[in-house]
Regions:
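Accessory nucleic-acid engagement/destabilization modules that flank
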Residues: 1-169
């Protein structure tokens, strides 16, 4: 079975250290999920935050990212988790999560319109696994457990403009 890593480790001269010094991807995603949940507990969104944290680096479950850890080219590793969140939890909760996941390195992108040379979330969600972004190893589904359903965030959206309220979430 393949072990995927979130981060490599280097010595003071920049040489890669042995794998036992590297952080496994499963450990990283679970830990980030737990930390995000703690931060979001104060406003009642701990479950959404936990799952967002678990998905933020999901694209690292790929051969392309493993090559990156060994000096290969950069790899889009955030879009995968954004896509999975929308596929699993839909266009409200999943899309709120997708903005966070897709923007966790580059900042938040616009939803549909043109922005500052960043791809929109709509464009990124349209990317295809194995063609536009790296295919994921199915191992992720064994290592990262996701609930089937998530409750809506504890907001009281405006009846006429509900997404305006969600934008502040």
């Amino acid at each position: 079975m393949t072990t995927y890593y979130a981060h490599s480790a280097q010595d003071e001269l920049g040489n890669l250290l042995p794998y036992e010094h590297w952080q496994t991807l499963q450990s990283h995603l679970v830990n980030v999920g737990e930390m995000a949940a703690e931060f979001a507990r104060v406003f009642g969104a701990q479950e959404i935050a936990c799952q967002t944290g678990k998905l933020h680096d999901l694209g690292k479950y790929s051969e392309a990212f493993d090559r990156r850890l060994h000096g290969g080219p950069s790899v889009d590793h955030a879009t995968a988790g954004a896509k999975i969140s929308v596929e699993r939890w839909g266009n409200v909760i999943g899309k709120l999560m997708a903005f966070c996941i897709a923007g966790h390195h580059a900042g938040l992108a616009n939803g549909n319109g043109e922005g500052d040379n960043r791809h929109t979330l709509k464009d990124r969600l349209a990317l295809q696994f194995g063609a536009d972004i790296p295919a994921l190893d199915n191992l992720w589904q064994q290592e990262i457990k996701l609930p089937q359903n998530l409750s809506a965030p504890p907001l009281k959206p405006d009846a006429h403009h509900p997404f305006f309220s969600y934008a502040f979430f």
